[in-house]
Amino acid sequence: YKRQGGLKPNPELPEWSFTPEPAMTAPVEKTVLGQEAEMIYLGWRTGGASSEDADMIQLVSSLLSNGKCGLLDVDIQQQQKMLGVGAEGLQLADYGMMVAIGYPKPGQTLEEARDMLLDEIGKLRAGDFDEELLASTIANYKRGEMQALEENGNRAMAYVDAFINGVDWKRSVEELDRLSKVTKADVVAWANEKLDPEVYAAVYKRQGVDPNIHKIDKPQITPIATNRDKSSEFLAAIQAAEVEAVQPVFVDYASDLSVGKMKQDIEVLYKQNTTNGLFSLYYVYDFGTTTDPAFGIASDYFDLLGTDTQSLQEIQREFYDLACSFGIHAGGERIYVTISGLAENMDKAVKLAEEYMQNVEGDDAVLAQLKANAMKARNDAKLNQNANFRALQQYTSVSYTH
């Protein structure tokens, strides 16, 4: 039986049941109006977290969008055909869903964005993708699981999610083994069964004033008696409990880190990872956007470029096959170049990253589209109230000198 800590289950409690949703036979399209930027959501219903569909949406969402060489990444994001695009799978107890999201670029309609997303779903259904991408997806999923399990919160949530969704724990821990046995034919068959291009739910988020908004009068606030002079037996027991003093452990840079020198007296700090089979390598440069604001957009520009011998898609695919990541982040005072992933592939990833940085080639058309997209993204941000609040907070707390 299921239990949580010292809580005893009620054997008389009836098992939850629900009335299944009727099968969808045609597109269900809804429009939401608001001041925020426009976007489109496409969704397909799948089985719940304990069904076979739960495994497939993990794979399919990564085949569509993984940040490097998914169908949406290569065909849309890296070619800047939309401002932003992505796909994800959501697993719940009764049903799951496969979702594709699109943010239109300047001059693009939501219907055009929708059709682009459906075209990529069509490629998946037709098997128009590299079968070797499946093996790379499994390796990257393995890497993601190792990273997640470094945090105690994620370990705890793995138990919680399995418990809430009614997934047998044995099935939960064997997920990676099952995924590794999935073939391209399995993916194509599943996509044709579940991702019908004629049967989906679409939500169009358009700009405008919603005429159906109902204003509610502000109610009179009722005073609340806080009873701060009283305490429950539970609180009293906690307050009376003996607490062992925490003994802090501080990093000793002299003994906990190995320090070395490279050419030109570049300092190297090293610490072996004894927790799992992952690595992280950082190149740190002591200048940033306060030195030159152009570094900010330069890092975004770099992410869209290839070299004289390799396209961006080929480079991203190599990193994905290695289950490694490479990125450049421009901060105010420093620029960070990060390489991370499976430790067994560290040498190959570092070599690939350094060759990429040394041989990257600019593209005027890519830069022009990046500028246009950046301006739209900034204008979209002005439509978001939270973004405006954050900008005001930053403006009032930071002194600008230029």
Could you describe each region identified by the protein language model?
Residues 1, 402:
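Single conserved hydrophobic/aromatic residue that forms the stacking wall/gate
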Residues 2-33, 38-39, 43, 74, ...:
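Proteolytic maturation boundary segments
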Residues 52-59, 77, 186:
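PPIase-associated folding chaperone regions across multiple families
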